[in-house]
Every structure is written in C-alpha cells, then in structure tokens.
C-alpha cells in the first residue's frame, strides 16, 4: 500500500501550496525560469482564466510523512477533444521529488479523474491550451530555460520510464540560434528583397497605439496564430475572450521593434499574413523574484531585462506564417527585420519555442543561421 496521500486542492491555502511547491523544489536552480506568482494564480483560477470557457480541471497535492512532495493538474480541454475526436484528460504542472511512489500516486489521481469524466486516455504534460508549457524535458538539463516553457530535473523522465502503460505521444525540439555578429545572412537578404518586390509584402513599423487601438494589431496577430497553429499537436482555437485576455496581459510587455508583422498589400485591408514575436530573456530576472513575487525587489530585475535589454539572450516566443504564403519566402522577411534589432541590442543568441520534431519546414528556417538543437521534450500517453 502506498504511503503517499493525495489531497485535492480545495481552497486558497491549498492553491498557494500548489503554486509555491515549484519555487521551493527549484530554489537556486540556475536553469529554471519560474513564473510570476500572480500569473500562476490567474492561470489556475476558474473565474480568471478564459480557458475555463471550454476546460475543466482539478489540482492535486501529494504528501508523504506529512510533507508536501508533489503536485499535478488534471485538465480536460473539451474544445481540443472535440476538434481532434480524442477523449483525453491532460496532466500538467507536474512537479515532484525523486520518488516513483509519488509519481504513481499523482498520475493515478489524474487517471481516476479522467475515468470519472468518461475520458479514454491520459496525455501530457500539457496545459489548458497551447499557450501553456508543453512537454517534459528529456534532454538539455544544463541549458537555460525560457518563460514560455517549463524546466524539470533529469529524474522526471527516468521516473516516467517506470510508469506502466505510458508511451511517447509527441516529441518537441528546441534550438539555440546564434545572432550574426554583423551584417545579414545573404540568403535571408536575397529572399526577403525578392519576396517584397514580387508579392508586394511589407513589414510595417508598429506603434503601441496600433496594437491596442482601433487598428487592433494585437487581435490580428492572434488571428494568424489561430490559423497557423490549427494543425499542431495539442492546439485548440483561441476564443475571442482568450484573445482579448492575451493582448491585455502580454502585449504590453513587448517592444514594438521586436513585434514583427508581415502584411499583404495586394489585399484591400493589408491583411496580416505572418508574425514574429521576440522578448529579451527574463529567465535570470525571474530567478531573482523570490517565490515569483515582483515586490519588493523583483520588479527591478524584470524591468532591467525588458527595457534595458540587460541579457545576452532573446526568446523567440512565436513565429507563424499563413500556409499559403510559406512557399513564397515570407518567413525570410521576419529575420530580415529582426536580425538587425537583435544586433542593435547585443543579443548573442536566440532561444526558439518548442517545435514538433516532425516539423521539418519550421526547422528548415534555421539553416542559414549557426544553430544548435539543444533541448528535447516529450509528451506521453496511456490508454485508460
């Protein structure tokens, strides 16, 4: 009989313990990018997170000998399940000590929750939507994490290998892209200039008022994401409420010279057909925010990274081109615009977001930059 006790998160005190367990487990870790506490509260609150329009969830804590030793979220994304005809419960935000009993108890709680809701399989690690961290790190444990992904210790996948019935569902890869010290790679320059001339595509210099004002470039960016990511593993279409939420929560932090859009001027409204969003790495700044709090001193480190670019690293949060424009070389326009910006701020390399290992077209974009595939993540599945 297991000595691990599973408790459902039932109140604010439990939720605080759920959120803070990650900070405690990874305190002092040089690679983890801990999320802000306020963002975590928003994510897990049913009355704040717009994903609860089509998701339901429960959160579980694991205790051993009276001590908190693990946590996990059980999530059902009904929108995804219906779109992909896949009745699955997701497990996410999995953290635990190096103990197989704890893992069995945590995933057992998610499995039981899924069965009670009529689900036929368990998949993960996944969040509520594609905007949440995805996959368990299986390679690259000595590499700097990003705010858009999650970090885990090397023993996590080793424990997963001991879990009966769990097999690979999908692998992601991540790349380190080295910024050219000077000049533009000839391939990007040639293709970008040809594409602008031949297809009448343009990359405007955006103002902040255009993102939040009547022109609604923030909404246009997320419309492109909905269309571009529609076929990807784990993705569900963003609702209007989600788009409103993401624009208000995140776009205020973006520097306008690192928010890149491509427009087709052959269309009456200059339709946005491609997007690229980068942000200075906040990992080191977030590590200095004690237990994810901006106050009393954490805010300065975040502002220093965002406004003064006091980091060598830039995170490539999002790159998307509408399918009908990919063969036209539109992606080269993004780098044509962004590489000089990276050089101006002194960034030495960029960290890509997760990419499906089978997505050779996305990975082909990096061929003309010095690059290194330095991380790998896995999502698992098990029939219930």
Predicted segment positions?
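Acyltransferase donor/substrate-recognition loop-hinge adjacent to the catalytic core
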Residues: 2-4, 150-232
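Acyl-donor binding region in acyl/amide transferases
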Residues: 83-165, 290-368
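Generic start-of-chain signal for non-secretory N-termini
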Residues: 1-31
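A conserved beta-strand-loop-helix scaffold within acyl/acetyltransferase catalytic domains
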Residues: 22-60, 64, 72-82, 208, ...
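Flexible loop/turn segments at secondary-structure boundaries
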Residues: 15, 78-81, 130-132, 182-183, ...
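Short beta-strand segments
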Residues: 123, 176, 261, 277, ...
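A structural motif corresponding to the C-terminal lobe/cap of the Radical SAM core domain
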Residues: 368-379
């Amino acid at each position: 009989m297991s000595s691990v006790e599973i408790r459902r998160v039932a109140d604010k005190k439990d939720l605080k313990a759920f959120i803070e367990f990650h900070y405690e487990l990874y305190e002092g870790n040089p690679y983890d990018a801990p999320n802000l506490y306020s963002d975590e509260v928003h994510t897990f609150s049913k009355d704040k997170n717009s994903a609860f329009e089509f998701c339901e969830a429960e959160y579980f804590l694991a205790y051993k000998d009276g001590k908190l030793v693990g946590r996990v979220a059980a999530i059902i994304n009904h929108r995804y399940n219906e779109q992909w005809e896949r009745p699955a419960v997701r497990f996410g935000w999995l953290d635990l000590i190096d103990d197989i009993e704890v893992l069995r108890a945590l995933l057992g709680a998610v499995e039981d929750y899924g069965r009670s809701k009529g689900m036929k399989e368990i998949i993960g690690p996944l969040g509520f939507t594609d905007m949440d961290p995805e996959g368990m790190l299986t390679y690259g444990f000595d590499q700097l994490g990003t705010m858009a992904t999650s970090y885990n210790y090397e023993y996590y996948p080793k424990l997963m290998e001991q879990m009966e019935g769990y097999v690979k569902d999908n692998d992601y890869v991540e790349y380190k892209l080295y910024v050219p010290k000077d000049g533009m790679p000839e391939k990007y320059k040639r293709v970008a200039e040809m594409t602008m001339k031949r297809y009448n595509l343009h990359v405007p210099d955006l103002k902040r008022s255009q993102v939040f004002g009547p022109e609604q470039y923030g909404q246009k960016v997320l419309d492109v994401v909905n269309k571009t990511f529609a076929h990807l593993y784990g993705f569900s279409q963003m609702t209007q409420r989600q788009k409103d939420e993401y624009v208000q929560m995140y776009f205020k932090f973006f520097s306008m010279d690192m928010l890149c859009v491509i427009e087709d001027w052959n269309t009456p409204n200059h339709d946005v057909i491609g997007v690229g969003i980068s942000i200075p790495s906040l990992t080191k700044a977030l590590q200095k925010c004690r237990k994810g709090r901006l106050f009393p001193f954490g805010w300065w480190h975040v502002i220093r990274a965002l406004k003064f670019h006091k980091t060598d690293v830039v995170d490539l949060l999002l790159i998307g081109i509408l399918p009908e424009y990919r063969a036209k070389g539109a992606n080269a326009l993004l780098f044509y615009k962004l590489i000089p910006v990276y050089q101006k701020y002194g960034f030495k390399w960029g960290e890509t977001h997760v990419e499906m290992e089978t997505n050779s077209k996305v990975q082909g974009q990096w061929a003309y930059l010095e690059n290194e595939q330095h991380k790998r993540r896995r999502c698992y599945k098990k029939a219930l």
